Every structure is written in structure tokens, then in C-alpha cells.
Amino acid sequence: MKWLRLQDLPTDNSFAALPAEFYTRLQPRPPAAPRLLHANAEAAALIGLDPAEFSTQAFLDVFSGHAPLPGGDTLAAVYSGHQFGVWAGQLGEVRGPAGGWELQLKGAGMTPYSRMGDGRAVLRSSVREYLASEAMHGLGIPTTRSLALVVSDDPVMRETVETAAVVTRMAPSFVRFGSFEHWSARRQPEQLRVLADYVIDRFYPECRVAGAGRLDGEHGEILGLLAAVTRRTALLMADWQAVGFCHGVMNTDNMSILGLTLDYGPYGFMDTFQLGHICNHSDSEGRYAWNRQPSVGLWNLYRLASSLHTLAPDPEALRAVLDGYEAVFTQAFHGRMAGKLGLPQFLPEDETLLDDLLQLMHQQGADFTLAFRRLGEAVRGQRQPFEDSFIDRAAAGAWYDRLAARHASDGRAAQARAAAMDEVNPLYVLRNHLAEQAIRAAARGDAGEIDILLKLLRNPYKHQPGYDAYAGLAPDWAAGLEVSCSS
């Protein structure tokens, strides 16, 4: 790869070619006296940026918001959305282009769309976002990426007084379901059409082609777009469920039109498994609980379809597209869980086997990640660690006997089966207490824990000697950790 200096990055900003109503050009209002806490060489490679640039003043200036990318525009993009099921109106974000990716500076100050917010992000939430996107990428789940984390001593008032930070995140596009909702709510079909054409041409060109992504009928391109987004969203929900990930704030403005995991706020990877686990303590009704995420994904797609109705005024056709969501999700989820259970395919009778395991884990508070990881050890003949994951070891053993009988029916060698299971059952996930340790170190100016976590989370399925503490159960002190929408 030919590495580029910051000043040489290509800055083809296709979003800025949209009509002026879609954004406002601005100078960010970032925190004072910024310091670079961490930069991500893997993410920099995606845009060809030389990691040697991390040590330059220009890098700090750009990714703190004190200077634009050379030759690029800094834009505040407008969108809207439903938050906790209620229409929230106009929102916005700061972004710019680089190397075919959009870069977004979260915490770089207010925009014309900020409403009552202050445009700031805090260290706590910024460290969590920086780590989470890389953790999800390591797990093989579609996600935005993190490029840089800049900190400042500027005070920011949240539930307590915290310090400011700016995290730069990357994606091919930050267009959201709420981007379409914005123009639909304002009854501006021309802008809605412009946005749909932009998304189709750049990311779903197959929707222009009959027999590829374009569906039959007068509005085949728009229906094809909805079908493609529906499929990606269903697959993403299956990915989340399979690793015990709770997003926490699945508002329509946090739903990517590309099927990426977007906006890491009060998320969590489950420790003790609960079917109705709520990771966001602001979610008093449990709207975004773990077991509700797939249905919320579909609810959000209905909001997107409603926004597209002006362009495809055929309710039955729109509904027919959305009716395909459940089958895609179920097939994908069952496929992922088959791998976690060491099954070559998921048969109808395996649904009871899976449901019984999840109920047993729920009733006995088993650790989601470790229980599945230890199944591989059980297949190798070491059943005790798996059974020790449950209070009632006999019940766990009885369930495992059923799985072993199912394994015997396909004749696969135990070592090959266990190795395949290890490739889909992670050993390391970003547990809240690990993120908290990194936050506390970062508050002292120490990025060492971030380095360790990135090392582990980039290879979450492989045991890495010397880091067993990062794969263990959460310590007692972590029981009181809470995350919320306060970032």
C-alpha cells in the first residue's frame, strides 16, 4: 500500500454535491487545548493514511475539529428520527470526506441542528465508542470504525461534571433511516428523491437493474432499495443476538441505511444472561431489551417504508417487502446459532434444543459469552467448565447430553467440531468493566488499557496467553456499573 500524508488524502465529497438543504458548511467549535489520546492504524489504513501522521500537529488539528481536512469540506448533515418510539424532529452531525469514507467528528461542537444539546461528547462515552466499533469489527459484525480519540480538560455537564473528548468515526456513509424521515416529515418529495437516488447510485446500484436488485413494478428501484436495507438490517440483528450484544438506543436516527452498527452509546455485551436484558438505564420501559431488538429493527424499517411511501405509493408492495424480514432474520440467526452449537445446519428440531439452553441460561444466570465458549471445551471432553457455568450442574449436564446426541448424528470429528465452534464463539468481548478500566486509565492520560483491549478484541476468537483476566467473569465491583443516554 502506498501511504498518504494527511494533506494528500483524496477528498471527493459526493455528499456535498447534494442540494444545500442537506447540510450546512461550518467551522466546528471543538474543545480547547486538545490532546491526542489514541489513533487507530488499522482504520487509517482504510483511507491510506500513513500512521506517521499521528504525531503531527496537523493530525491533531484536523481530528480535534480545529482545522478541516486539507481540500475538504466540514459539513453539518441534517436528519431526523424517532427516539424511543416518539418523533424527535430535527437532528444533525459533523462530517467530512477522506479516501472514499466519511469521517465524523463526534463532540466537535454545536451544529445548526443541535436543538438543546451542547455538541460535546465526554471522555467516558468517547472511549466506549472508540473501543466498541473495533470490537464489533473484530467479531465480524458490520460497523462504523474509529480513527482517532482526542481529549481535553474542558468541563462538560452531564449527570456529573465530566471532561470533553472528540472521537472520529468512519463509515462509507452515515445516512440513516432518519435521513429519509426528515424529508418525508417536511413533505419535500423532491429532496426525498434526491436522497434515494444518491443512496442507490453510490451503495445499491443493483437496484437500477432488473433481475438484480430492482423489483418488479412501477416503483421497482425504491422497493429494491427497501428490500436491500431490510435484508441488511435483518442480518445485523442476527449478528447482534448471536454475540449477546445490546445496542441500547435503537432510535431510527441510529439505524444505518447500509446495515452498519451505528452510534455506540449505552450499549453492552451481556455478562449474566437475561432474555430481557436492558443495557441502558435510561430505558425504563425496556423498549430496547435484548430479546426485543429484532422486532424493533422491523419497527424501524416500517418507519423507513413510511418515509418512502411518497416515492412508492403502493402500501401493499411496501408491506410485502417488509414481510420478508422475519424469514431472513430467522434463517440468519439459526445459522449463527448452529455454528455456536457445533451443528452443520440448523434443523427444525434444533429450535427446542436452543430455546432450552437459553431458558436454562436465563434461569440460572449463566454468562452468555463463557457458556458458549465452554461448549467447545465440552466437545473436547472437558465438560466441567461448561457445567460449572450453571448453578444446577446436573441440569446443564442433561442438556449437554442432548447436544452430544445431536452431534453424534452427523459423525464429525470432535476436534474439528470444537475448532469450528471456537471460531464463532468469542473468548473476548468488550464487557462493561473492561471499558470502565480503560476509561479510568484514559482519565489519567494512560492509553495502555486501550492498547491491550484493541489487541484482544481484534482477535476475539483466539486465546492470547497472559490475558486470561480479560476473558473472565465480571468482578463484583462491576455489578454497579450503569450506562445511559447521557453522553
From Swiss-Prot:
The keyword ATP-binding applies. Its cofactor is Mg(2+); Mn(2+). Mg(2+) binds at residues 254, 263. It holds the Pfam family SelO. The active site is at residue 253. InterPro entries: SelO (IPR003846). Its EC number is 2.7.7.-, 2.7.7.108. Nucleotidyltransferase involved in the post-translational modification of proteins. It can catalyze the addition of adenosine monophosphate (AMP) or uridine monophosphate (UMP) to a protein, resulting in modifications known as AMPylation and UMPylation. Belongs to the SELO family. This is Protein nucleotidyltransferase YdiU. It comes from Bordetella pertussis (strain Tohama I / ATCC BAA-589 / NCTC 13251).
